[in-house]
Amino acid sequence: MGRMKDRNASAGPEVKPAGLSPSRFVKVFMHGEPFERKINLAIHNNYDSLSFTLKRLGNNYSMSPFELEGFVNNEEDGAIDNDFDLLYDDMNGVRYLLGEVPWEVFTITVKRIYIVPAEQQNESEYQEEEEDNAAAAATADEDVDGNHWWRNHLWSVGPILQ
């Protein structure tokens, strides 16, 4: 007797393109803080919205995740006037200022975001302090063989960056 295929069974897991995901969480590190936060890039359409949220987060980094939920452009809270520089690392570990590349490229390649006080003049001093955080986070991104998860997925980003 031959076996009939179940019409409802799928051939494999459904894969969504990275840009269409309903959520895209990225780790955010604040200079001098021992822990990181995560922010959902999917709720932001541009750098202005993201910068506004990150600067508010910089002022309120110790708030609980529940208090930060929905922490988007809310004009009722007033303008934010603070001195934070916003940096990020891409998948290759290259550090950029937020806004240096087109938004679409940023959303695909960003791996970590850093909120740094603007008075921090010596970037190498900052980088030494953040290496501990980055080393701890990098081990979380490796599989049991020590391979980075994104190395197998670079083909999906390549054509966009060219």
UniProtKB/Swiss-Prot annotation:
InterPro entries for this protein: AUX/IAA_dom, AUX_IAA, PB1-like
Subunit-structure text: Homodimers and heterodimers.
Biological process, per Gene Ontology: auxin-activated signaling pathway; regulation of DNA-templated transcription
Note: Lacks the EAR-like motif (domain I) which is conserved in the Aux/IAA family.
Primary localization class, coarse: nucleus
Pfam families: AUX_IAA (PF02309)
Species this protein is from: Oryza sativa subsp. japonica
Family designation: Belongs to the Aux/IAA family.
UniProt name for this protein: Putative auxin-responsive protein IAA28
Domain of life: Eukaryota
